Amino acid sequence: MTISSAHPETEPKWWKEATIYQIYPASFKDSNNDGWGDMKGIASKLEYIKELGADAIWISPFYDSPQDDMGYDIANYEKVWPTYGTNEDCFALIEKTHKLGMKFITDLVINHCSSEHEWFKESRSSKTNPKRDWFFWRPPKGYDAEGKPIPPNNWRSYFGGSAWTFDEKTQEFYLRLFCSTQPDLNWENEDCRKAIYESAVGYWLDHGVDGFRIDVGSLYSKVAGLPDAPVIDENSKWQPSDPFTMNGPRIHEFHQEMNKFIRNRVKDGREIMTVGEMQHATDETKRLYTSASRHELSELFNFSHTDVGTSPKFRQNLIPYELKDWKVALAELFRYVNGTDCWSTIYLENHDQPRSITRFGDDSPKNRVISGKLLSVLLVSLSGTLYVYQGQELGEINFKNWPIEKYEDVEVRNNYDAIKEEHGENSKEMKRFLEAIALISRDHARTPMQWSREEPNAGFSGPNAKPWFYLNESFREGINAEDESKDPNSVLNFWKEALRFRKAHKDITVYGYDFEFIDLDNKKLFSFTKKYDNKTLFAALNFSSDSIDFTIPNNSSSFKLEFGNYPRSEVDASSRTLKPWEGRIYISE
C-alpha cells in the first residue's frame, strides 16, 4: 500500500503506523514470585504482545527508585530498580523485543527526580554547593503565628497541598510540583540540562532504545520569579500553577536542544521517536511541539478527552457532561494536525487513567464486552499513533467498592489527607472526592495483570506469592488472557481483529485527514467522516443501550461496510439502525 504525502504534509514513519503497547512493570508479570512484575516477566510475555498485533512496547519507569510514586521518582537514571531485575535483564529484553520485530520505548522522567538522587543530595547539602541551582530553592515568604515557615508562593502540588517542601538543614523550601520526594529539576541551569541528557537519554540510546515517552514534558520551563498563581479555587489556599509552569517561555528551546542531542547521539541510522505528555495546550502550541520541521517532538499526548467530566479547579471533583463534550474533546487529539507536518496520538487508557469501559462505555455484565469492542472500533478508526494499555485488550474494568485503605496511589492518599485536614472526613468535599476516585483513580489501571483465573493471583504471581497491590476481582469472571484467548467472541480476540483491520487500511485509518463530525449534537451517536486521497471513511458508533438510527453521508451507495463489533452474520449492512453499543466502519472508494 502506497502512502501518499500529498495531504496532510506528512511522511510515513514506523512510529506513526505503530500500535504501541504500554507496560506498567510492577503489575505486568512476576517471574520470581516476589509479588512484583519484572524484566524477565515482561520478556516471557513478548510473544503475547506480538500476537495481539502491537508493533512496539513502551515500559513505564523501571529505574532505581524509592518508589514513592511508583518509579516516577528516579534515584539513578542508569540503573534498573533491583526488584525489576538487572541492567543486563533489561538489555536482554531490548534485544528480544527487536528480534520479534518490535520497537522498545522507555519512559523519560526528567521534570523532577527523587530526593534520593545524588544530584539532589548534593544540592541540599549546603547553600553554596555547586548543584544548589540544579533545583528550585527559595526562602520562606514569612512565618505564621505558630512560627511555621510559609511557602514562597501559593502553588498547589498535583498531589495535593503546597508545591513546596521545607528543608530543615538549610532553612529553605524546594519546589516539587508532585510529591515531596520529587524535587523539580531547574532546566534554566545549563549544566543540569547537560547532565540530564547524558544520564537519562544518552545512556539508554547507547543501549538500543527506539524512543522515549516524555513525562510531563510541558513543565520544564517555569516563569521567572515563580509568582503567585491566580485564585480559581476559592475553597483552597493552594492554586493550580499551570499559568506559570505549563508550556513556559523556554519550553520549545529545551525540547529542540534535547532533540538535537538525540539526533547527534544515534550513529546507527535508527529513527528515534519521542512522544510528549503535554497535558493541556492550544492547537497552535501543539503544532509548535510536533511540527517535523521544528525538531522538538514526534507526537504528543493531550488530556482533553480524559479530563471530560472532571472539574478544572480540582480533577477529583466530577461534573456532568454529555457525549458531545467528549466527542469534541477527543477530536482535539488530532484535528490540529490536518494539513500540517505535525503528528499526534490516539489513546483512552494509560497508567494515569481508569479503565475506559467503566469511564466511557458500560461495564455492566450485559454490556461490558460489546461496549469494550465499540471502544476498540472507535480507536482503530481514528488518525494518529495508537496506544493500548495492558489489560485494555482484555476489556478490564474498574475495581468496585474498595475502601480508601486499599488505594495505593500517592495522588489519592495525599489528596485524601489534604481534604481531611482542610474540610473534614465527613465533609461534602470528601464525599465528592471519594465518588471521583471510584471512577477516575489511577489505581484502577495499576492492579496486577489478569493472565488467568488461577487463584489467588490470576497468573500474575505464583499462588504462594503476595502481589504488591490487590487484584481486581474481575479475573474470576472471565476477564483474563487465558480464558479470553479460547473464546472467539472475547474482547481480546476482537482487539486482534481490530488491529489487523487498522493495518490493512492504514492509509485511511492511520493517515486519514479532513475529519468531520456528523450529527454532533446527538447524545447517543458518535459519527464522523474522514478522507485519504479518493477514499472516505464513515464511522457510526452507538454509545447507548438503545437501538438508534443513523444516516449514511449523502445516502451514498458507494460506502461498503468494512468493520464492526457485532458478528457479520447478525448485521444487515443495508440497515440504518444500530444495535445497543454497536459500531460500524464504512469505506467508500
Swiss-Prot record:
The active site is at 215 (nucleophile), 277 (proton donor). GO terms for biological process: disaccharide catabolic process; maltose catabolic process; sucrose catabolic process. It catalyses: Hydrolysis of (1->6)-alpha-D-glucosidic linkages in some oligosaccharides produced from starch and glycogen by alpha-amylase, and in isomaltose. The keyword Hydrolase applies. InterPro entries: Glyco_hydro_13_cat_dom, Glyco_hydro_b, Glycoside_hydrolase_SF, O16G_dom_2. Induction: By ethanol. The record marks 352 as: Transition state stabilizer. Keywords: Glycosidase, Hydrolase, Maltose metabolism. The keyword Hydrolase applies. SUPFAM superfamilies: (Trans)glycosidases, Glycosyl hydrolase domain. Its EC number is 3.2.1.10. Pfam families: Alpha-amylase. CDD domains: AmyAc_SI_OligoGlu_DGase. GO terms for molecular function: alpha-1,4-glucosidase activity; alpha-amylase activity; glucan 1,4-alpha-maltotriohydrolase activity; oligo-1,6-glucosidase activity; sucrose alpha-glucosidase activity. Belongs to the glycosyl hydrolase 13 family. Alpha-glucosidase with specificity for isomaltase, methyl-alpha-glucoside, and palatinose. This is Oligo-1,6-glucosidase IMA2. It comes from Saccharomyces cerevisiae (strain ATCC 204508 / S288c). The gene is IMA2.
